[in-house]
């Protein structure tokens, strides 16, 4: 969702592309060196997409994006069924740990029956230097760090579901690991 949001911002604010384009080589090299989960290169990209716009304008764009995204998001029945099963069990703590910014997650899924019943850990954004930046990039090993801050160590998790190999550091601590395929099917991981 985060990448889609930044593309959405650039489509709505095409002049920011003039700022983003010269930043892309720096961002690309930094991601190659530091890895895809690095915070500052993506923070620089977000800043380039949002620089020069008021907080009110950016909040409106965020809200507009959430409405647009809700119309295009595809629900995966198998994944929803598993989530519902865990929610109905009443003996599990359920965590949604996502690389998407928390305000986007909350706005896109605000009316779902499950959002109020899960614990959310997400990427955080804040205002700095005339735009938005990432104050926390919740991706890769950072997901482990953030969950350990909430529930302590050592992590012992029953099951984990992910659509990305970036989540393998967190899935390592799960007894049962599942990869969500692009078509919404579940593949059990070893």
PLM region spans:
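A general alpha-helix detector
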Residues: 4-5, 42-45, 64
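Helix-loop "lid/cap" segments that line or gate small-molecule binding pockets
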Residues: 29-33, 41-52
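C-terminal cap/substrate-recognition subdomain and adjoining C-terminal extension
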Residues: 56-63, 67-190
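N-terminal short leaders/motifs
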Residues: 36-42, 116, 120
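Active-site neighborhood of HAD-like aspartate-dependent phosphohydrolases
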Residues: 1-34
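Generic short alpha-helical segment signal, independent of protein family or function
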Residues: 10, 34, 50-54, 63
């Amino acid at each position: 969702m985060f990448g889609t949001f930044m593309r959405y911002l650039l489509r709505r604010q095409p002049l920011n592309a003039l700022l983003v384009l010269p930043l892309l080589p720096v961002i690309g090299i930094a991601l190659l060196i530091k890895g895809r989960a690095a915070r500052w290169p993506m923070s620089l990209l977000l800043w380039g997409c949002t620089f020069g716009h008021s907080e009110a304008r950016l909040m409106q764009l965020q809200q507009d994006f959430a409405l647009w995204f809700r119309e295009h998001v595809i629900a995966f029945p198998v994944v929803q069924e598993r989530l519902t099963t865990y929610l109905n069990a009443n003996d599990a703590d359920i965590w949604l740990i996502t690389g998407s910014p928390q305000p986007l997650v909350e706005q896109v899924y605000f009316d779902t029956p499950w959002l109020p019943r899960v614990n959310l850990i997400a990427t955080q954004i804040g205002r700095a230097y005339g735009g938005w930046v990432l104050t926390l990039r919740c991706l890769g090993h950072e997901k482990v760090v953030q969950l350990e801050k909430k529930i302590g160590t050592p992590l012992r998790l029953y099951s984990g579901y992910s659509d990305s190999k970036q989540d393998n550091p967190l899935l390592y601590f799960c007894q049962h690991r599942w990869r969500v395929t692009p078509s919404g099917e579940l593949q059990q991981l070893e």
